[in-house]
Amino acid sequence: MIVRIQRTLLLGTLSLLLLPTASRAQEAASPDLLAQKRTVSDIRNVGTAMWHWYKEEVAPKRSKKAHEQAEKESKATTVDLQRVPVISREDLAAILVPRYVAAIPAADGWGHPYEFRLNTKDPNAILVMALRSAGRDGKFSDTHYEVKAFEPTDFDQDIPWMDGYFVRWPQKPESGR
């Protein structure tokens, strides 16, 4: 009886130790999850570079009114990327590389091109920068987005970033709600 209890405790402890490893192995086995993680990382890196460029090159030239409007816009629950002009990867690289980032990736984790947007002409524009991935299916859903997370296993969701934050991002729903 004691041996059986000890064996049960040992097996229970081992399963608790191996469970996170099995979860990581399952994660590694999912090419879509890896592609999504790489895409989020790329967007975060390029977005951070764009943000540093903005802080150094654009923000000092903005009017107080433009700063106030941008602050108000940052609290919006919806955004429309059409308000920011598209810029080519090459033109963006000419602005950011090598000072702010080593390179601008051409494609997301699924091999689809990123879309880059940057307003280089009007320092008083309310929205200045954006970039996005179309997700696994390679098709952008729209330019208008509600600011919120999406189920991380929905790999076809667009992943847009704008003016310093993710507009849509993969995140598991909170439990208990």
Language model features with spans:
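Surface-exposed patches in mature extracellular/periplasmic domains of secreted proteins
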Residues: E56-H67, I104-G109, Y114-R117
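Internal low-complexity, small-residue/proline-rich segments
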Residues: D80-P113, A125
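Structured segments of extracytoplasmic/periplasmic soluble domains
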Residues: V46-E56, I95, R99, A103-I104, ...
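Conserved hydrophobic/amphipathic alpha-helical signal-anchor segments
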Residues: Q26-A93
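Sec/Tat signal peptide C-region and signal peptidase I cleavage site
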Residues: T21-A25
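Short, surface-exposed interaction loops/tails
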Residues: Q26-W51, L118-R177
